[in-house]
Amino acid sequence: ESCLSYELLECMATPIPPHSNALQSSNLWNSSREIKIFPEMTYKELVGNHGIQTWLENIQRVGFVLVKNTPATAEATKELMERIAYIRSSIFGGFSVWDNKLETPDDTAFTSLAIEPHTDGTYLHDAPGLQTLHCIQRDAEGGNNQLIDGLAIAETMRKKYPEAFEILCNINIPGRYIKTDTYLQAYRPVFRVNDDGEV
């Protein structure tokens, strides 16, 4: 049995921090013109300890960072990612390298087609929170990508179409991944809100 004084417990108690949702993007945007400071950093900045805080703040601020001058190797990309998080294993392995050299591609990730706005991992029970894309070698035309702010879309829907927003917060929608030897499925609402109503 332990006996601790009130004074010791009070001294060791951690004060309750002011509420903040570290995952909530602080600057919602609908076009690149709305981003006041475009988040660009160099690989050299990020491998040094001084750049990590700015990197994470930029991710929190607008949801992404464009990293320039990264060595054209998967190893350099992996090393960079492991500076801020662990790499989660999935059906594709721990760290995936994709190319467009398949004979019969059945996924736009393997082609030179532009990838339309979408959400990855909806078929996983624990979808990715942060994803990294690095074009190591480019010898074809096309394959352009675009980024969208899903949180801005959710907030626009909440304001303009509140009934639709509520439906998308409360109805589970199936996400599926179907291949010859793989079938994954998870059900979840399109939007999720926390106890404070934040998406």
Identify the function of each model-found stretch:
Residues 1-26:
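Hydrophobic, ordered structural segments
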Residues 26-64, 69-199:
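Active-site environment of non-heme Fe oxygenases that use a 2-His-1-carboxylate facial triad
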